[in-house]
UniProtKB/Swiss-Prot annotation:
Family: Belongs to the ATPase epsilon chain family.
Chief location bin: membrane
Record localization: Cell membrane
Function text: Produces ATP from ADP in the presence of a proton gradient across the membrane.
Protein name per the record: ATP synthase epsilon chain
One Pfam family it belongs to: ATP-synt_DE_N
Organism phylogeny: Bacteria, Bacillati, Actinomycetota, Actinomycetes, Mycobacteriales
Gene: atpC
Membrane topology summary: Peripheral membrane protein
Keywords of this entry: ATP synthesis, Cell membrane, CF(1), Hydrogen ion transport, Ion transport, Membrane, Transport
Amino acid sequence: MAEMTVELVAVERRLWSGSATLVSAQTTEGEIGVMPGHEPVLGQLVEAGVVAITTADGERIVAAVHGGFLSVTAKTVTILAESADLAEDIDVEAAKAVLAESGDDLEAIAVAKGRIRAVERA
């Protein structure tokens, strides 16, 4: 099966880089699925969204992303997020505690909800 190079990068670090056969992400225009050979596109990621990557080995990588951009060419996908966490690194109980204690902090609530969704989709 055809492959493409994918990079998942947050402002503070690179979360994942490698070969993949499918990337799905939530953009402001809706959910997009990208396979090798996809037409070039630049999309804005939603706040508190989820990105899922199917690696060339068939492994599924899921991350909670908060804002940023998705850049697609025929052979590469670059995800540049304002912040991001791999689902395997997310503490769901801590995210639920943030939801319970956030009050009016809409950004904290959105980030916590995105983290919980990423774990559920992993």
